[in-house]
Protein backbone atom coordinates (compact mmCIF):
# COMPACT_ATOMS: atom_id res chain seq x y z
CA UNK A 1 0.00 0.00 0.00
CA UNK A 2 1.29 3.44 -0.97
CA UNK A 3 -0.39 6.58 0.31
CA UNK A 4 -0.93 9.40 -2.23
CA UNK A 5 1.07 11.74 0.01
CA UNK A 6 3.94 9.28 0.34
CA UNK A 7 3.55 9.23 4.12
CA UNK A 8 4.00 6.10 6.21
CA UNK A 9 0.77 4.50 7.44
CA UNK A 10 1.35 5.82 10.98
CA UNK A 11 2.57 9.27 9.97
CA UNK A 12 0.67 12.49 10.65
CA UNK A 13 0.61 15.32 8.17
CA UNK A 14 2.78 18.33 9.00
CA UNK A 15 0.91 20.13 11.81
CA UNK A 16 1.36 23.79 12.71
CA UNK A 17 -0.42 25.70 15.47
CA UNK A 18 -0.07 29.49 15.33
CA UNK A 19 -1.40 31.27 18.42
CA UNK A 20 -2.76 34.84 18.68
CA UNK A 21 -3.68 34.74 15.01
CA UNK A 22 -6.34 37.45 15.31
CA UNK A 23 -6.26 40.44 17.65
CA UNK A 24 -9.82 40.73 18.97
CA UNK A 25 -10.75 37.28 20.29
CA UNK A 26 -9.60 36.22 23.75
CA UNK A 27 -8.09 33.11 22.16
CA UNK A 28 -7.23 32.59 18.50
CA UNK A 29 -5.29 30.01 16.52
CA UNK A 30 -4.51 29.13 12.94
CA UNK A 31 -4.20 25.35 12.86
CA UNK A 32 -2.78 23.56 9.82
CA UNK A 33 -2.97 19.81 9.20
CA UNK A 34 -1.12 19.61 5.90
CA UNK A 35 -3.20 21.63 3.44
CA UNK A 36 -6.20 21.83 5.77
CA UNK A 37 -6.22 25.25 7.45
CA UNK A 38 -8.71 26.40 10.10
CA UNK A 39 -8.98 29.63 12.07
CA UNK A 40 -10.23 28.88 15.59
CA UNK A 41 -11.29 31.67 17.95
CA UNK A 42 -12.71 31.64 21.47
CA UNK A 43 -14.75 34.65 22.61
CA UNK A 44 -15.81 35.33 26.19
CA UNK A 45 -19.14 36.90 27.13
CA UNK A 46 -20.77 37.53 30.48
CA UNK A 47 -23.89 35.52 31.28
CA UNK A 48 -25.09 32.02 30.47
CA UNK A 49 -28.01 30.57 28.50
CA UNK A 50 -31.40 30.66 30.18
CA UNK A 51 -31.38 26.95 30.98
CA UNK A 52 -28.26 27.46 33.14
CA UNK A 53 -29.26 30.62 35.00
CA UNK A 54 -28.89 30.28 38.76
CA UNK A 55 -27.00 27.00 38.56
CA UNK A 56 -23.56 28.48 39.26
CA UNK A 57 -21.80 27.24 36.17
CA UNK A 58 -20.61 28.52 32.82
CA UNK A 59 -21.14 27.25 29.30
CA UNK A 60 -19.27 26.61 26.06
CA UNK A 61 -20.82 26.40 22.62
CA UNK A 62 -19.31 26.11 19.14
CA UNK A 63 -19.99 27.13 15.57
CA UNK A 64 -18.30 25.80 12.43
CA UNK A 65 -18.22 26.98 8.85
CA UNK A 66 -16.26 26.90 5.62
CA UNK A 67 -15.28 29.69 3.26
CA UNK A 68 -17.03 29.28 -0.10
CA UNK A 69 -13.75 28.47 -1.86
CA UNK A 70 -12.18 26.37 0.89
CA UNK A 71 -12.70 23.42 -1.47
CA UNK A 72 -11.92 22.71 -5.14
CA UNK A 73 -15.21 24.22 -6.29
CA UNK A 74 -17.02 27.17 -4.76
CA UNK A 75 -19.81 26.32 -2.34
CA UNK A 76 -22.68 28.70 -1.68
CA UNK A 77 -22.54 30.35 1.73
CA UNK A 78 -25.00 28.76 4.13
CA UNK A 79 -26.10 32.23 5.23
CA UNK A 80 -27.27 32.98 1.68
CA UNK A 81 -29.26 29.72 1.68
CA UNK A 82 -30.96 30.76 4.89
CA UNK A 83 -30.03 27.71 6.96
CA UNK A 84 -27.12 25.58 8.08
CA UNK A 85 -26.64 22.17 6.54
CA UNK A 86 -26.81 18.91 8.47
CA UNK A 87 -23.05 18.35 8.19
CA UNK A 88 -22.32 21.78 9.66
CA UNK A 89 -24.68 21.22 12.59
CA UNK A 90 -23.18 17.80 13.27
CA UNK A 91 -19.61 19.11 13.27
CA UNK A 92 -20.23 22.13 15.46
CA UNK A 93 -22.05 19.99 18.01
CA UNK A 94 -19.09 17.61 18.01
CA UNK A 95 -16.67 20.50 18.60
CA UNK A 96 -18.79 21.81 21.48
CA UNK A 97 -19.17 18.40 23.13
CA UNK A 98 -15.46 17.73 22.81
CA UNK A 99 -14.29 21.00 24.32
CA UNK A 100 -16.82 20.94 27.16
CA UNK A 101 -15.12 17.71 28.25
CA UNK A 102 -11.97 19.77 28.88
CA UNK A 103 -13.64 22.01 31.46
CA UNK A 104 -15.14 21.98 34.93
CA UNK A 105 -18.03 24.32 34.19
CA UNK A 106 -18.65 25.00 37.87
CA UNK A 107 -15.29 26.83 38.01
CA UNK A 108 -15.91 28.91 34.92
CA UNK A 109 -18.32 31.29 36.62
CA UNK A 110 -21.16 33.16 34.95
CA UNK A 111 -19.51 33.16 31.53
CA UNK A 112 -20.20 31.74 28.09
CA UNK A 113 -17.35 30.76 25.77
CA UNK A 114 -18.12 30.94 22.06
CA UNK A 115 -15.86 28.78 19.90
CA UNK A 116 -15.80 29.65 16.19
CA UNK A 117 -14.00 27.37 13.73
CA UNK A 118 -13.76 28.69 10.18
CA UNK A 119 -12.19 26.49 7.52
CA UNK A 120 -10.21 28.60 5.05
CA UNK A 121 -8.82 25.61 3.13
CA UNK A 122 -10.06 22.02 3.26
CA UNK A 123 -8.06 18.90 2.44
CA UNK A 124 -9.67 16.36 4.77
CA UNK A 125 -9.93 16.23 8.55
CA UNK A 126 -11.47 19.67 9.08
CA UNK A 127 -13.40 18.64 12.20
CA UNK A 128 -10.40 17.01 13.85
CA UNK A 129 -8.19 19.99 13.03
CA UNK A 130 -10.88 22.32 14.41
CA UNK A 131 -11.02 20.50 17.74
CA UNK A 132 -7.24 20.35 18.06
CA UNK A 133 -6.74 24.03 17.26
CA UNK A 134 -9.71 25.29 19.25
CA UNK A 135 -8.36 23.53 22.35
CA UNK A 136 -5.24 25.69 22.23
CA UNK A 137 -7.33 28.83 21.66
CA UNK A 138 -9.45 27.81 24.66
CA UNK A 139 -6.40 27.62 26.93
CA UNK A 140 -5.37 31.12 25.85
CA UNK A 141 -8.89 32.44 26.47
CA UNK A 142 -8.84 31.03 30.01
CA UNK A 143 -5.56 32.87 30.63
CA UNK A 144 -7.20 36.13 29.55
CA UNK A 145 -10.18 35.53 31.86
CA UNK A 146 -7.80 34.96 34.77
CA UNK A 147 -5.88 38.16 33.98
CA UNK A 148 -9.18 40.04 34.07
CA UNK A 149 -9.79 38.80 37.59
CA UNK A 150 -12.04 35.86 36.80
CA UNK A 151 -11.82 32.16 37.69
CA UNK A 152 -11.97 32.83 41.43
CA UNK A 153 -13.05 29.22 41.97
CA UNK A 154 -9.83 27.85 40.51
CA UNK A 155 -8.64 26.63 37.13
CA UNK A 156 -11.53 25.08 35.16
CA UNK A 157 -9.19 23.24 32.79
CA UNK A 158 -9.32 19.51 33.56
CA UNK A 159 -7.41 18.09 30.61
CA UNK A 160 -6.38 18.75 27.05
CA UNK A 161 -8.50 17.53 24.15
CA UNK A 162 -7.46 16.67 20.62
CA UNK A 163 -8.73 14.77 17.61
CA UNK A 164 -7.44 12.86 14.62
CA UNK A 165 -8.81 10.78 11.77
CA UNK A 166 -7.89 7.20 11.00
CA UNK A 167 -9.18 4.84 8.36
CA UNK A 168 -8.81 1.67 6.35
CA UNK A 169 -7.14 2.56 3.05
CA UNK A 170 -6.42 -0.20 0.53
CA UNK A 171 -6.90 -2.74 3.32
CA UNK A 172 -4.51 -1.13 5.81
CA UNK A 173 -5.09 1.20 8.79
CA UNK A 174 -3.72 4.70 8.13
CA UNK A 175 -3.45 7.83 10.26
CA UNK A 176 -4.67 11.37 9.53
CA UNK A 177 -6.36 11.00 6.15
CA UNK A 178 -6.20 13.79 3.59
CA UNK A 179 -9.01 14.36 1.09
CA UNK A 180 -7.75 11.90 -1.55
CA UNK A 181 -7.45 9.13 1.03
CA UNK A 182 -10.70 10.00 2.76
CA UNK A 183 -12.65 9.87 -0.50
CA UNK A 184 -11.23 6.43 -1.35
CA UNK A 185 -11.09 4.89 2.15
CA UNK A 186 -13.05 1.74 2.95
CA UNK A 187 -13.56 3.02 6.52
CA UNK A 188 -13.27 6.50 8.00
CA UNK A 189 -12.98 7.05 11.75
CA UNK A 190 -12.81 10.36 13.66
CA UNK A 191 -11.40 9.96 17.16
CA UNK A 192 -11.54 12.58 19.94
CA UNK A 193 -9.36 11.88 22.97
CA UNK A 194 -8.24 13.39 26.26
CA UNK A 195 -4.63 13.91 27.25
CA UNK A 196 -5.19 11.31 29.98
CA UNK A 197 -5.93 8.64 27.37
CA UNK A 198 -9.74 8.58 27.46
CA UNK A 199 -12.06 8.68 24.47
CA UNK A 200 -14.58 11.50 24.07
CA UNK A 201 -16.03 10.38 20.77
CA UNK A 202 -15.44 7.77 18.09
CA UNK A 203 -17.29 8.37 14.82
CA UNK A 204 -16.90 5.57 12.33
CA UNK A 205 -18.41 4.71 8.96
CA UNK A 206 -17.75 1.83 6.57
CA UNK A 207 -17.89 3.17 3.02
CA UNK A 208 -17.10 -0.06 1.18
CA UNK A 209 -17.05 -3.31 3.11
CA UNK A 210 -17.88 -3.61 6.83
CA UNK A 211 -14.85 -3.27 9.08
CA UNK A 212 -13.95 -6.05 11.48
CA UNK A 213 -13.31 -5.80 15.27
CA UNK A 214 -9.58 -6.35 14.80
CA UNK A 215 -9.48 -3.55 12.21
CA UNK A 216 -11.31 -1.23 14.61
CA UNK A 217 -8.80 -2.04 17.35
CA UNK A 218 -5.90 -1.41 14.95
CA UNK A 219 -7.36 1.97 13.96
CA UNK A 220 -7.88 2.98 17.59
CA UNK A 221 -4.29 2.05 18.45
CA UNK A 222 -3.11 4.13 15.51
CA UNK A 223 -5.28 7.03 16.69
CA UNK A 224 -3.76 6.82 20.18
CA UNK A 225 -0.26 6.99 18.70
CA UNK A 226 -1.20 10.02 16.64
CA UNK A 227 -2.90 11.72 19.57
CA UNK A 228 0.21 11.38 21.73
CA UNK A 229 2.10 13.32 19.06
CA UNK A 230 -0.68 15.91 18.76
CA UNK A 231 -0.76 16.52 22.51
CA UNK A 232 2.99 17.15 22.40
CA UNK A 233 2.45 19.65 19.58
CA UNK A 234 -0.25 21.44 21.59
CA UNK A 235 2.06 21.53 24.60
CA UNK A 236 4.91 22.95 22.52
CA UNK A 237 2.64 25.61 20.99
CA UNK A 238 1.44 26.72 24.44
CA UNK A 239 5.02 26.86 25.75
CA UNK A 240 6.01 29.63 23.33
Curated annotation (Swiss-Prot):
Keywords: Nucleotidyltransferase, RNA-binding, rRNA processing, Transferase, tRNA processing, tRNA-binding. Phosphate binds at residues 87, 125-127. It catalyses: tRNA(n+1) + phosphate = tRNA(n) + a ribonucleoside 5'-diphosphate. Its EC number is 2.7.7.56. Pfam families: RNase_PH, RNase_PH_C. The keyword RNA-binding applies. One of its GO terms (molecular function) is tRNA nucleotidyltransferase activity. One of its GO terms (biological process) is tRNA processing. The keyword rRNA-binding does not apply. Belongs to the RNase PH family. PANTHER family: EXOSOME COMPLEX COMPONENT, EXOSOME COMPLEX COMPONENT RRP41. Phosphorolytic 3'-5' exoribonuclease that plays an important role in tRNA 3'-end maturation. Removes nucleotide residues following the 3'-CCA terminus of tRNAs; can also add nucleotides to the ends of RNA molecules by using nucleoside diphosphates as substrates, but this may not be physiologically important. Probably plays a role in initiation of 16S rRNA degradation (leading to ribosome degradation) during starvation. Homohexameric ring arranged as a trimer of dimers. This is Ribonuclease PH. The gene is rph.
Amino acid sequence: MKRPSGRAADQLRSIRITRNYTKHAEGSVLVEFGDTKVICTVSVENGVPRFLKGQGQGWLTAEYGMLPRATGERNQREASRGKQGGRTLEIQRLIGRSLRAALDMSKLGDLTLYVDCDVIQADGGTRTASITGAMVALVDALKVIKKRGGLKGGDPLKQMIGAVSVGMYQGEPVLDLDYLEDSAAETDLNVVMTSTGGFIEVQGTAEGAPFQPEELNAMLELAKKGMNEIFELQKAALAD
